[in-house]
Amino acid sequence: MGKLFDKIRRVQDKTRPFCSAIVPAAGSSARMGGQDKLLTDLCGAPVLMRTLCAIDRTELVDEIIVATREELLLTVADLCGRCGLHKPVKVVRGGSTRAQSVLAAALEANPKAGLLAVHDAARPLVEKQFKAGLDTL
């Protein structure tokens, strides 16, 4: 029932811009010695899953766009499906740099997006800070 009220609140609040959360996740995890840090288990779930769930709980975000490496597109899409996210999620091919990944995701944002929030995929413990940052806008 809480999700229904969240949707009603969003419809009523027409002053808030549509927000697309961009999650760059195309890095090579070079400092991890070849182990992909985003898929590493953190207390029972991959780091990326925890990050996406935290963003999903943020009321001010309307959609999530994950930019990842080509070889991880299916893996990340499957992970997103297993997260039980409530917001629409897109998984897109990222670039060879963070800037290219952010651009690739931004180009896939909903045309209604008046705000793009970029958050690093490897930082799952963000919920309060992410929300506080968006609240100040």
Model-derived regions, located:
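N-terminal glycine-rich phosphate-binding loop and ensuing alpha1 helix
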Residues: 16-70
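Short glycine-rich anion-binding loops that position phosphate/pyrophosphate groups of nucleotides
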Residues: 27-30, 70-72, 96-97, 121-124
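Conserved beta-loop-beta/alpha segment of the NTase-like Rossmann-fold superfamily
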Residues: 97-137
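Structural motif
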Residues: 42, 67, 92-93, 119
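Conserved donor nucleotide-binding strand/loop of the catalytic core
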Residues: 84-96
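Acidic helix N-cap motif at the loop->helix transition within catalytic regions
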Residues: 74-79
